[in-house]
Amino acid sequence: MRSGIIAKKVGMTRLFMEDGKQIPVTVLSLDGLQVVAQRTEDKDGYTAVQLGAGSAKVKRVSKAMRGHFAASKVEPKRKLVEFRVPADGLIEVGAEISAEHFLEGQKVDVTGTSIGKGFAGAMKRWNFGGLRASHGVSISHRSHGSTGQCQDPGKVFKGKKMAGHMGAARVTTQNLEVVKTDADRGLVFIKGAVPGPKSGWVTVKDAVKKKAPEGLPFPAALKTAAEAAAEAPAEGGEA
């Protein structure tokens, strides 16, 4: 089991394949994805890696977190996520993960916070069919109808599909295909839609319900020191 990655959702576009087919894809950006800390069995009781992504202003980071980043010799990050890994899957603190962590054609699971829709009725929230347009139905055309039984049990069961707050929830979309990766620009192109709005953070992991392809970099695809040094002047020039 490998570590996942943290990525920022850039938006959607389309890619043209060699046979002329066009595929809708979501573009995910790896923004300074680094290992911030390790969790070990001896010290923490489990093994995991803590990854950080995005750049945070120092004045917006708490004193405790500034010390945490300083101990790892890593710049303050906007987003931190832990990924459980086996002992041999631990990654060195400070290492930067590349977009080549995934292979083209590989299946992945993407987790994010869905776009909030506010209060929604049963037809929009749960795809209910609603009541009849006529034949005695007045006012209640879009209502959900009956919600339970009679005197026994005399209540509405928890989890009953009714009107309520829609979206803004943690959602995982499984078995999405990696169409293309661009290590130079730190981009991963995922077939179809992924949860969340533009500029939202998502996590991407190897699909749990599909067999991993051969040749996956283990424990991760890391950027070399030369690649990191080559990117630094370019980033400074853009700023």
Curated annotation (Swiss-Prot):
Q: Which UniProt keywords apply?
A: Methylation, Ribonucleoprotein, Ribosomal protein, RNA-binding, rRNA-binding
Instruction: Identify residues that carry N5-methylglutamine.
Output: 151
Q: Which InterPro entries match?
A: Ribosomal_uL3, Ribosomal_uL3_bac/org-type, Ribosomal_uL3_CS, Transl_B-barrel_sf
One Gene Ontology cellular component term attached to this UniProt record is: cytosolic large ribosomal subunit
Return one GO MF term.
rRNA binding
Q: Which domain of life is it from?
A: Bacteria
A GO BP entry: translation
UniProt modification remark? Methylated by PrmB.
Keyword Ribonucleoprotein recorded: yes
Partners and quaternary state? Part of the 50S ribosomal subunit. Forms a cluster with proteins L14 and L19.
* Primary role: One of the primary rRNA binding proteins, it binds directly near the 3'-end of the 23S rRNA, where it nucleates assembly of the 50S subunit.
Family label: Belongs to the universal ribosomal protein uL3 family.
List the NCBIfam families.
Answer: L3_bact
- What is the designated name of this protein? Large ribosomal subunit protein uL3
Q: Which organism is it from?
A: Ruegeria sp. (strain TM1040)
